[in-house]
C-alpha cells in the first residue's frame, strides 16, 4: 500500500515504511524519523 508521490504518510506503518524507502514523501516523526522530498 505505497502512498503516492507528494502525499503525506497517514500514520499507517506500511505507508511510512514505503515513504522512508523511496524518500519522496513526508514521513512523521512518530516512527523515529522525519523525511521530506
UniProtKB/Swiss-Prot annotation:
Single GO molecular function: calcium channel regulator activity
Pfam families for the chain: Toxin_34
Keywords per UniProt: Calcium channel impairing toxin, Disulfide bond, Ion channel impairing toxin, Neurotoxin, Secreted, Toxin, Voltage-gated calcium channel impairing toxin
InterPro entries: Omega-agatoxin_II/III_CS, Toxin_34
UniProt modification remark: Disulfide bonds are present.
Main location: secreted
Gene Ontology annotations for the cellular component aspect, listed alphabetically: extracellular region
Record localization: Secreted
Family: Belongs to the neurotoxin 04 (omega-agtx) family. 03 (type II/III omega-agtx) subfamily.
Other noteworthy facts: Negative results: this toxin does not inhibit Cav3 (T-type) channels.
Functional note: Omega-agatoxins are antagonists of voltage-gated calcium channels. This toxin blocks calcium channels in insect central neurons but not at peripheral neuromuscular junctions. In vertebrates, it is broadly active against all high-threshold Cav1/CACNA1 channels and Cav2.2/CACNA1B channels.
Protein known as: Omega-agatoxin-Aa3d
Amino acid at each position: 500500500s505505497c502512498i503516492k508521490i507528494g502525499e503525506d504518510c497517514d500514520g499507517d506503518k506500511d505507508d511510512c515504511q514505503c515513504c522512508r524507502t523511496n524518500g519522496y514523501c513526508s514521513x512523521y516523526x512518530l516512527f523515529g524519523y522525519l523525511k521530506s522530498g
